[in-house]
Amino acid sequence: MRAEIQTIVADIEKSLDLLAQRMNWETAEFRLEEFNARVEDPNLWDDPAAAQKLMRDRQSLVDAMDTYKSIRQDLQDSVELIELGEMEEDAEVVKDAEDTLKALKEKAAQKELEALLDGETDPNDAFLEIKAGAGGTEACDWASMLARMYVRWAESRGFSVELQEEQAGAEAGIKSATYQIKGHNAYGWLKSESGTHRLVRISPFGKGTRETSFAAVGAYPVIDDNIEIEVNPADIRIDTYRSSGAGGQHVNTTDSAVRITHEPTGIVVTSSEKSQHQNRDIAMKALKSRLYQLELDRRNAEVNALHEAKGDAGWGNQIRSYVMQPYQMVKDLRTNHETADTKGVLDGDLDGFMAATLAMKVAGKSRADAQGED
């Protein structure tokens, strides 16, 4: 077996070892038996929220076990085919099996990363909020570029994207926009994107000068029914208004848009679908997501530090820099992960940055756990 293929096999084995460690493979079968026994309980659905959580936890374990077994079996089959092909000097069989191993390596690495998304709300859908910061028209244009980037990233993963609210810029781009990203682990991936994003480029608005623009990104989990968030009606103010857009036959011309302000925290959420009733539901769901995240921030120092970086979109709160002039470079200031493929990133190729941030957080948690055991 060629040295390159031996390295690929070793990489897959490493990913499998980490997958087994994350799911605690030694006790997985026992835990699945426990889940199955509880599912058979005739009183299970007396508590619907607990039942739904149990079913999700069970399915998550089943999926993890099936993935591990599938990758392990495919690895074994491919290695055996290569060895057989080499014995029989069948180059075509060897090449096909090697190609399978290369694809399997990518799959194993991806599943290894997904296994790290083990937060309570990591599997949930996400609200993604983008706001233009310092820089006027330049910043509004930059905010629209970020919106396009995230939409393309989400679509490349098979997630669905719904625009909940958008406020157009005075001359170009957007002042703000809120999306709901629907898909498994949507929040788990997007939570690392919260913070200020900085762009350096030559102005496209006729100035010909190098400009620096900022936009703030915030990601919040869509809260499932099993997580209860109480909102005191006395604490909120609900306003209706006419939605503003770029115009055209589909623009919302009724006073159906809804803005909800949570007085104690100052949180403001909006929705501008055609139905006012639907807008109230969407905006209230977004408010509960924000309040839930706020509570997590209070209890979790790491998350708190991350979300404090979402403050004013300016120099002091950057998480990532996108430079288009005088050179091409996108660099994450937390992990130092970087690439010269600026176009690829702006077209939605964000997985490398998200993976680097996730790996950094897991490594930090592991160090903290180790220190706690000392």
Swiss-Prot record:
Signal peptide region: none
Q: Which residues form a coiled coil?
A: none
Could you tell me which residues carry N5-methylglutamine?
Answer: 249
Relate the protein's function as given in its record. Peptide chain release factor 2 directs the termination of translation in response to the peptide chain termination codons UGA and UAA.
**Entry GO terms, CC:** cytoplasm
Q: What is this protein called?
A: Peptide chain release factor 2
Record note on modification: Methylated by PrmC. Methylation increases the termination efficiency of RF2.
Hey, which family's this protein in? Belongs to the prokaryotic/mitochondrial release factor family.
Q: Which PANTHER family match?
A: CLASS I PEPTIDE CHAIN RELEASE FACTOR, PEPTIDE CHAIN RELEASE FACTOR 2
This protein's UniProt keywords? Cytoplasm, Methylation, Protein biosynthesis
